[in-house]
A protein has these predicted regions:
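Metallo-beta-lactamase
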Residues: 132, 139-202
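Active-site HxH/HxHxD metal-binding segment of metal-dependent hydrolases
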Residues: 38-41, 46-131
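Active-site neighborhood of phospho(di)ester-bond hydrolases with catalytic His/Asp-centered motifs
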Residues: 32-35, 54-63, 81-85, 144-147, ...
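Conserved beta-strand segments of alpha/beta enzyme cores
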Residues: 2, 11, 53, 80, ...
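Active-site environment of divalent metal-dependent phosphoester hydrolases
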Residues: 37-39, 62-67, 88-91, 149-153, ...
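Conserved beta-strand hairpin/beta-sheet module of binuclear metal-dependent hydrolase folds
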Residues: 1-50, 154-165
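A short catalytic or substrate-binding loop motif that flags glycine-/basic-rich loops and adjacent residues
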Residues: 13-16, 125-127, 146-149
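Short, basic/glycine-rich phosphate-binding loops at helix/coil junctions
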Residues: 22-26, 108, 168-173
Length: 202
């Protein structure tokens, strides 16, 4: 997992799935998502190699490929987990995760032990209408981008870098998935229209 600079203090950990972060200083960072649970060791090793302690996770949405290590970092490092209200409600308990992943029954938590590490009580919940959050002296803009999930958010870093997460898919992904997953196709399309008007440096 390679740490690559995007702009200013905004960096990305480059693996098969990108994990963005914002450096608050030489030793502290804010993670924008944590990837999948099977990236955990690689992610932690990359952070340790860079001398970075994740003081917060500003999580885009409650899918396992974006919040797979939220609970782990919260428990082992005291990392603050920050999520929007609609996403936080889905991952506070095994039942919430089961309701989100309706193809899982409660027995799946025994069959897939990784699911047992996923439930997480966020330290801070972004309420509807909250458009900014201050973390460690840095100001982040919150953009509501629902559709892929019920309360998906995108984040603008202080460097004017916009992290869209799954609000918009790359051409590489669309080549394989012609129409990506959306819990609400109407809201997803509305979000895409809205994003056409959003400007950012990166």
């Amino acid at each position: 997992m390679e740490l690559r600079q995007v702009k200013g203090n905004t960096w990305v950990l480059d693996s098969w799935e990108l994990i963005p972060l914002y450096k608050l200083d030489a030793h502290r960072c804010v993670l924008l998502d944590t990837g999948t649970w099977d990236q955990r060791d690689e992610l932690e090793a990359a952070l340790d190699a860079a001398g970075l302690d994740p003081v917060a996770i500003l999580c885009s949405h409650a899918h396992m490929d974006h919040m797979g290590s939220n609970a782990y970092f919260q428990k082992t490092r005291g990392t603050q987990v920050i999520m929007s209200l609609g996403e936080a409600a889905q991952i506070m308990s095994p039942l919430g995760i089961q309701l989100q992943y309706y193809n899982f029954n409660m027995g799946a938590f025994g069959q897939y032990p990784e699911l047992g590490t996923a439930p997480c009580l966020p330290d801070r919940i972004l309420l509807p209408g909250e458009r900014e959050i201050e973390i460690g002296g840095a100001q982040f803009e919150i953009l509501p981008t629902p559709g892929h999930t019920i309360d998906h958010i995108s984040v603008r870093t202080p460097d004017d870098v916009l992290y869209l997460a799954d609000a918009m898919m790359t051409g590489r992904i669309l080549h394989h998935a012609k129409f990506p997953y959306a819990i609400s196709v109407g809201e997803y399309l509305d979000t895409l229209v809205k994003l056409r008007e959003v400007k950012a440096a990166e």
